[in-house]
């Protein structure tokens, strides 16, 4: 989903390097609704999406009205979001969402009251013999298809792309470029927040505010996914699966012979080769 977030921004002429921060706010929104409000999973997902969208809209606002580069503001908001969420969860070890024994947020799967916030698996866990395989992957694919339809088959999508290609021409055509810049970043942020909700509501992991002193890798992996897919929303489905297989596979390598960082090296080489292919295609 962070790959789709970055790809969407690319398609509308913006560089959303703030997907990590938007992902962080989305994670907090999903976990807060699940743990504190005991809401069902679909409500938690909506809140995660809204928070991610708000966090993405702020750099968009600065870009639209003050012409401040979205890369600078989104990088700043990455770190603001990270430390804000860590403090809200940890609260000096007394936070109601924080499990002191495990130094993480409360496990949604350990309580019948909290487990209703988990995304249903419809037998996928039994099929794949895991405890975190849910319908999240199908929801993500459906959203990717929806984004493709919006960008390529609707007037709204055409306006967003037109503003990205040429703001002045879009303005002369009667398109409100400021509104569309903010909307583009808000939608990109919402996609990243939605992805965080899918991840944490599938109970893949719990948030650790003590270890979370670096930004979630998913936010930056999204850049690789978007580049590999050439910013095609449908392509992000397959490039995300490919990149995630490399990343997860690296963690299972024998450290006696290979460092786990070799997976990052492979991903980096792939991205460089993708960039070279675009260069050669442009010359041809």
Stretches found by the model and what they are:
Residues 1-36, 49, 53-57, 61-68, ...:
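Single transmembrane alpha-helix segments in multi-pass membrane proteins
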Residues 19-27, 44-52, 70, 74-78, ...:
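Alpha-helical transmembrane segments of multi-pass membrane proteins, especially transporters
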Residues 165, 172-179, 250-284:
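Cytosolic-side transmembrane-helix boundaries in multi-pass membrane proteins
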């Amino acid at each position: 989903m962070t790959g789709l977030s970055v790809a969407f921004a690319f398609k509308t002429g913006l560089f959303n390097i703030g997907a990590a921060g938007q992902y962080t706010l989305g994670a907090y929104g999903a976990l807060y609704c699940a743990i504190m409000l005991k809401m069902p999973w679909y409500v938690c997902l909506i809140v995660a999406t809204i928070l991610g969208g708000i966090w993405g809209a702020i750099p968009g606002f600065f870009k639209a009205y003050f012409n401040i580069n979205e890369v600078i503001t989104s990088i700043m908001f990455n770190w603001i979001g990270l430390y804000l969420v860590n403090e809200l969860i940890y609260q000096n070890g007394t936070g109601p969402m924080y499990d002191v024994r495990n130094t993480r947020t409360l496990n949604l799967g350990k309580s019948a009251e909290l487990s209703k916030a988990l995304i249903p698996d419809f037998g996928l866990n039994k099929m794949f013999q895991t405890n975190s395989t849910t319908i999240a992957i199908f929801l993500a694919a459906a959203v990717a298809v929806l984004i493709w339809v919006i960008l390529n088959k609707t007037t709204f999508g055409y306006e967003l792309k037109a503003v990205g290609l040429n703001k002045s021409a879009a303005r002369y055509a009667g398109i409100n470029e400021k509104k569309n810049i903010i909307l583009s970043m808000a939608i990109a942020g919402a996609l990243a927040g939605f992805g965080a909700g899918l991840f944490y509501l599938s109970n893949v992991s719990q948030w650790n505010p003590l270890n979370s002193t670096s930004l979630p890798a998913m936010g930056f992996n999204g850049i690789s996914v978007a580049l590999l897919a050439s910013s095609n929303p449908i392509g992000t489905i397959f490039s995300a699966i490919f990149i995630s297989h490399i990343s997860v596979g690296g963690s299972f390598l024998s450290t006696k012979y290979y460092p786990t960082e070799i997976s990052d090296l492979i991903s980096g080489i792939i991205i460089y080769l993708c960039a070279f292919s675009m260069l050669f295609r442009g010359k041809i």
